[in-house]
């Protein structure tokens, strides 16, 4: 039987998200593996990876809010907006900022904001990724995007090299937010070039660092031990309401039937479970037929 479930991985620094997917394909002996939100190589932390038929839920996990802890450094800007790029601007910070000043700066970024993705990013413009233009030395107009910062807090003032100022922060944001760019924009508001000097993802939707298993620990496991670490695919769908189907309704759902809408189903998408607690399907309102609902994704044979 094909392995199916979700691995909550604690990705180490130095690995790309694709590296992790490649390794999971080897360990679980299946090609059907997908991750749910890229982490840059030098960013560590929570990376949920879907195995086997659990890849059906990747599209729902990509919309998760993410939480990070990191560090911003004022005084130096880089090509990549993080600590690994070439220095492009420097301005000495002669006087340290107070906690009150930093907290006021951060407050200005809470809510919906506009971001311009960094040149060294995977965003596509005219069919090519921005990092391809950057490596070729070609400047192009970068599209802005609206993202939402749901929480942004100062955790501590950290030690910086002479002429710089650094602080640690925690942020919760919507998908597509570039924390590197957020760090740069905070610096601009403070009047200094800046970059993101550290970053760790601590949560992706319902999956937290407390759930995550280090890659090094997976490497030491047998196949059976790895299979035991797989979480059911519906743990990724906790944000959808659930309805229990009786045996007769279960038969119809398994056949992908269009059903009459019931008041108990609510107005949005929801999950059907059978009486044994197995996740059967995600249903939605029929797009053209009022009063009916149809399956969006079937999980019956998982």
UniProtKB/Swiss-Prot annotation:
Reaction(s) this enzyme catalyzes, per UniProt: uridine(55) in tRNA = pseudouridine(55) in tRNA
GO molecular function: RNA binding; tRNA pseudouridine(55) synthase activity
EC nos: 5.4.99.25
Keywords from the named record: Isomerase, tRNA processing
InterPro entries: PsdUridine_synth_cat_dom_sf, PsdUridine_synth_N, tRNA_psdUridine_synth_TruB, TruB_C
SUPFAM superfamilies on file: Pseudouridine synthase
Isomerase keyword on record: yes
Function: Responsible for synthesis of pseudouridine from uracil-55 in the psi GC loop of transfer RNAs.
PANTHER family per record: PSEUDOURIDYLATE SYNTHASE TRUB1, TRNA-PSEUDOURIDINE SYNTHASE
Protein name listed in UniProt: tRNA pseudouridine synthase B
Organism: Shouchella clausii (strain KSM-K16) (Alkalihalobacillus clausii)
Taxonomy of the source species: Bacteria, Bacillati, Bacillota, Bacilli, Bacillales
């Amino acid at each position: 039987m094909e392995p199916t479930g979700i691995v909550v991985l604690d990705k180490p620094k130095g690995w790309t998200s694709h590296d992790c997917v490649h390794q999971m394909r080897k360990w679980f002996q299946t090609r059907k593996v997908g991750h749910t939100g890229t982490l840059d190589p030098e960013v560590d932390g929570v990376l949920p990876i879907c195995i086997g038929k659990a890849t059906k839920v990747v599209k729902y996990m990509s919309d998760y809010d993410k939480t990070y802890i990191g560090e911003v450094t004022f005084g130096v800007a880089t090509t990549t907006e993080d600590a690994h790029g070439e220095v492009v601007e420097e301005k000495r910070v002669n006087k340290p900022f107070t906690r009150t000043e930093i907290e006021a700066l951060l407050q200005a970024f809470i809510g919906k904001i506009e971001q311009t993705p960094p040149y060294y990013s995977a965003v596509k413009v005219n069919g090519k990724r921005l990092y391809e233009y950057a490596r070729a030395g070609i400047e192009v107009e970068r599209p802005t995007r609206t993202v939402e910062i749901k929480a942004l807090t100062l955790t501590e003032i950290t030690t910086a090299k002479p002429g710089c100022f650094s602080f640690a922060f925690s942020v919760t944001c919507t998908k597509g937010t570039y924390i590197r760019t957020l760090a740069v924009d905070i610096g601009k508001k403070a009047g200094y070039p800046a970059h993101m000097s550290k970053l760790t993802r601590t949560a992706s939707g319902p999956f937290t660092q407390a759930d995550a298993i280090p890659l090094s620990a997976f490497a030491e496991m047998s196949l059976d031990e790895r299979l035991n670490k797989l979480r059911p695919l519906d743990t990724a769908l906790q944000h959808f309401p659930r309805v229990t189907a009786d045996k007769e309704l279960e038969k119809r759902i398994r056949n992908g039937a269009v059903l009459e809408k019931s008041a108990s189903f609510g107005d949005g998408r929801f999950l059907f479970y059978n009486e044994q607690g197995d996740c059967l399907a995600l249903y939605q309102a029929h797009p053209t037929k009022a009063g009916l609902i149809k399956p969006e994704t079937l999980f019956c044979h998982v």
